Amino acid sequence: MYGYPLPTTPRLSQEEAAGRLYPFTDVVSPANFTVKAMHLLFSFASQDRQTAWCDTPLFPALFRRAGYDTLMFDNQTTFTLENDDVWDQEIRHFLYHPRLSPQLFTHCNADKYPFDEGLLADFDRQDLRFRNPHRLTIFHLMGQHVAYRNRFPAEAGYFTADSIPEYSTSGLRRSRDERRIVADYDNAVRYNDRVVGEILDRCRTRDAVVVYLSDHGEGVVDYAHRNGRVHDAALSADGCRP
């Protein structure tokens, strides 16, 4: 959709061609890691005004007070206290604190799935339970987090190392192993496109608006012989653009 030479977003490109999707072209994330971005996304806090998320309302709570059912399907967080992953704990104590979560969500999923399509089956089950016509549904996908090869099922593998040019757009010469990593990332993007397409299919006959925010970017052997990103709050705008 944004000029990448390989077909990583066939579903969303199809929606755009049909005039059903309107891509934003000038959007900057407030952070390049999930927790900080979600602090600002779910609240009325502002990066520009340097306000804290906990000093403003969280928008799902406003929907609840307005009479909406608010359903949350999260595939990045486990809901057991035994998980000691620091990022998992930050999200869990932010959105899923026992005192806060009931004010935000009518329903949260109890299970985490190997792949994001598991959330769709969970949604289908809950869709039969909640009949309120006024509903806010949030999907928090695992997306394209490392390790990329773990973010799509084997049958969704579309690209191989042979699909990836030897030289990156910056002129970096990539080994075959590095091109395989890029192919894994591209496959994760393409699988994510499939999941988002299935969400759109479920909303097609409803009076609904779908807003999709893509995963934070990753440097995948573009400018250096490495992949991933720096978890740093002090970032330039260019470093956060998709």
Q: Where do the PLM segments sit?
A:
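Catalytic domains that recognize anionic headgroups
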Residues: 1-242
